[in-house]
Amino acid sequence: MDPVLVLVLTLSCLLLLSLWRQNSGRGKLPPGPTPFPIIGNILQIDIKNISKSFNYFSKVYGPVFTLYFGSKPTVVVHGYEAVKEALDDLGEEFSGRGSFQIFERINNDLGVIFSNGTKWKELRRFSIMTLRSFGMGKRSIEDRIQEEASCLVEELRKANGSLCDPTFILSCAPSNVICSVIFHNRFDYKDEKFLNLMERLNENFKILNSPWMQVYNALPTLINYLPGSHNKVIKNFTEIKSYILGRVKEHQETLDMDNPRDFIDCFLIKMEQEKHNPHSEFTIESLMATVTDIFVAGTETTNITLRYGLLLLLKHTEVTAKVQAEIDHVIGRHRSPCMQDRTRMPYTDAMVHEIQRYIDLIPNNVPHAATCNVRFRSYFIPKGTELVTSLTSVLHDDKEFPNPEVFDPGHFLDENGNFKKSDYFMPFSIGKRMCVGEALARTELFLILTTILQNFNLKSLVDTKDIDTTPVANTFGRVPPSYQLYFIPR
């Protein structure tokens, strides 16, 4: 038989099979565009701006629709009401973690971010309790952040007002706060091993936001055998985990069961307590994955928010001037900012919230999954079905935030200039899977940004009207463009 005819017949059969599967499930899953065989709806999605495609599909199919990434159906939830219903009202039913193929290869479904079931619940509960015992959400962690913010200021002063690339110096501060909790030490800002870890994290976040990685996650079986940037991500994570393993071994050699120094010690003690339980989730592999999760998430997300925030403040000089005036009035120049100041600084508080809302760091959240068969609105979502929630559709809702594409702290101020809370503010997600480190991140952002603006004026290398704040990546997360600036002592 002619090879071309065989190919045509094969493709036709695949198309018919796909249509049959799609139609047979259409009475259950939400509506959506018809997928192609094997590749699904990938060609119908703008991989460089997935949120834009989701917005289009929501207008065609409604706030809940189905897309196929490869051969697997994914339910997409768009808009505040639908997102809240899925993650909050049905939080337990949708508390599963959807697949993120690159991390499955790296962490083997361990840790607190990408694990599932009993494993996830036990590791998350332990992590939250342990982080709290080391000051998370308490005055003690605030003291550490203040101390680190002061170290950052001293490091910036050493530049003597010369041109500075903030990429790595800003990552050092939040990373050192996390390191003090999990490793019981901080690093000098010039430490080569430390800077190498920061570079690996920065490089990975950029690669994870590339269109190639979205294709990889949709077609992992095929892509696994091809060269590509996914191999660089795995190599970088191997290097990071190798460093962490070295620190774990040091802790094992010096462990005092009665006096835990940090998160690693607490985990090792828990392992010892459960050593006779063959089903224990507390293993050396789980320790490695959990520490990696906390270290990576606690460093890079806050770093990017700080970096993006300074870029926005560099461009919007009128906002910066108002914040500095409030800092001078409430705090002055001779003491460090503290969290108690926040209630008397509504404009600064609004500025920090607006940075997070505007940059929309993780536009479509980390994927969730149904832990059981779920009746969601008028649809039936089978157990294991992946769920993507559009945080962009909430953070950039034009009814809650008029002109959402404009950076404006007024989005969080009432008519009297008082800070105004919004239920639509969910950069850390909501529900059972919301970010473990939300309280820490909020504290870091307020204290570090106010400390920088208390001590420095920001000066741009180019005219402020020429500053581009458009993200250079806009898939899994949003990455600001590279830039340089002058930190001029006040």
UniProtKB/Swiss-Prot annotation:
<dbReference type="InterPro" id="IPR017972">
    <property type="entry name" value="Cyt_P450_CS"/>
</dbReference>
<dbReference type="GO" id="GO:0005886">
    <property type="term" value="C:plasma membrane"/>
</dbReference>
<keyword id="KW-0349">Heme</keyword>
<keyword id="KW-0492">Microsome</keyword>
<protein>
    <recommendedName>
        <fullName>Cytochrome P450 2C55</fullName>
        <ecNumber>1.14.14.1</ecNumber>
    </recommendedName>
</protein>
<dbReference type="GO" id="GO:0005506">
    <property type="term" value="F:iron ion binding"/>
</dbReference>
<comment type="similarity">
    <text>Belongs to the cytochrome P450 family.</text>
</comment>
<dbReference type="GO" id="GO:0020037">
    <property type="term" value="F:heme binding"/>
</dbReference>
<dbReference type="GO" id="GO:0071614">
    <property type="term" value="F:linoleic acid epoxygenase activity"/>
</dbReference>
<dbReference type="GO" id="GO:0042573">
    <property type="term" value="P:retinoic acid metabolic process"/>
</dbReference>
<dbReference type="GO" id="GO:0016712">
    <property type="term" value="F:oxidoreductase activity, acting on paired donors, with incorporation or reduction of molecular oxygen, reduced flavin or flavoprotein as one donor, and incorporation of one atom of oxygen"/>
</dbReference>
<keyword id="KW-0479">Metal-binding</keyword>
<keyword id="KW-0408">Iron</keyword>
<dbReference type="GO" id="GO:0019369">
    <property type="term" value="P:arachidonate metabolic process"/>
</dbReference>
<dbReference type="InterPro" id="IPR050182">
    <property type="entry name" value="Cytochrome_P450_fam2"/>
</dbReference>
<dbReference type="InterPro" id="IPR001128">
    <property type="entry name" value="Cyt_P450"/>
</dbReference>
<keyword id="KW-0472">Membrane</keyword>
<dbReference type="Pfam" id="PF00067">
    <property type="entry name" value="p450"/>
</dbReference>
<keyword id="KW-0560">Oxidoreductase</keyword>
<dbReference type="GO" id="GO:0008401">
    <property type="term" value="F:retinoic acid 4-hydroxylase activity"/>
</dbReference>
<keyword id="KW-0256">Endoplasmic reticulum</keyword>
<feature type="binding site" description="axial binding residue">
    <location>
        <position position="435"/>
    </location>
    <ligand>
        <name>heme</name>
    </ligand>
</feature>
<dbReference type="GO" id="GO:0043651">
    <property type="term" value="P:linoleic acid metabolic process"/>
</dbReference>
<dbReference type="InterPro" id="IPR002401">
    <property type="entry name" value="Cyt_P450_E_grp-I"/>
</dbReference>
<comment type="function">
    <text>Metabolizes arachidonic acid mainly to 19-hydroxyeicosatetraenoic acid (HETE).</text>
</comment>
<dbReference type="InterPro" id="IPR036396">
    <property type="entry name" value="Cyt_P450_sf"/>
</dbReference>
<dbReference type="GO" id="GO:0005789">
    <property type="term" value="C:endoplasmic reticulum membrane"/>
</dbReference>
<dbReference type="GO" id="GO:0008392">
    <property type="term" value="F:arachidonate epoxygenase activity"/>
</dbReference>
<keyword id="KW-0503">Monooxygenase</keyword>
